[in-house]
Amino acid sequence: MVHQTIQGTFRQTNLTNESAEYLGKREELRLAEIELMRHRERVAELRRHLPPGPAVEDHKFIEGPVDLDTGDTPTRTVRLSELFTAADRSLVIYHLMYGKRQTKPCPMCTAWIDGLNGVAHHIAQNVDFAIVSAAEPAALRAHARARGWDRLRLLSAGDSTFKYDLGSEDREGKQDSAISVFNRDSHGTVHHFYTAHPWMSPEIKERGIDLLSPIWHVLDLTPQGRGDWYSKLEYPMRSSA
């Protein structure tokens, strides 16, 4: 085995019996991966340097007890501006497809939030984060309880137009997923910074927020790729054979 390093850090693993064809294709892939990382940083820089966004309504949400195990009442009303814990922190909200015309929780949203719950304590070191759903508080909390979402702030949009205003709900109550970022200025006014949707263009189907989940990236490492796999709320038990 040969270890190639850059400044003492492992760059790539090469086994001694690799064919010339494999070596050539692997090097082509390595260079493409480097360019992808550089391009991703260029995109992130464009996002970071967006000019100030428009002011938004200080929407009201319904929130239950912090501890899911204590039940679903009492509930309280909390405003969008109150979700910020410090003046210099951004607020990130994931729009869960559940409620109104969406009578069952979206399996893909659920998979993403499963992962977000696991890293919520890391996210909280930098930004404020919450899940917003059109579902009633009790229904949202029941789903969260079943999934073990014990690290996330769970909010029901209730009668608010929040999801409609941000493009994750239509006039008939059909739901879509999205992730939104907000900032609050020195006067306490909340401004929209950025919202990403899964469907970015006709040829990019439900891949607009792939970076939120490691699932796709793990699958993309394999020769089988992601294929047409789609997440489910439950899976059959796999045998060990």
List each language-model region with its residue ranges.
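Non-globular targeting/processing and membrane-anchoring segments
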Residues: 2-91, 96-121, 125, 143-145, ...
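Thiol-based oxidoreductase modules, predominantly thioredoxin-like and allied folds used
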Residues: 120-139, 150-161
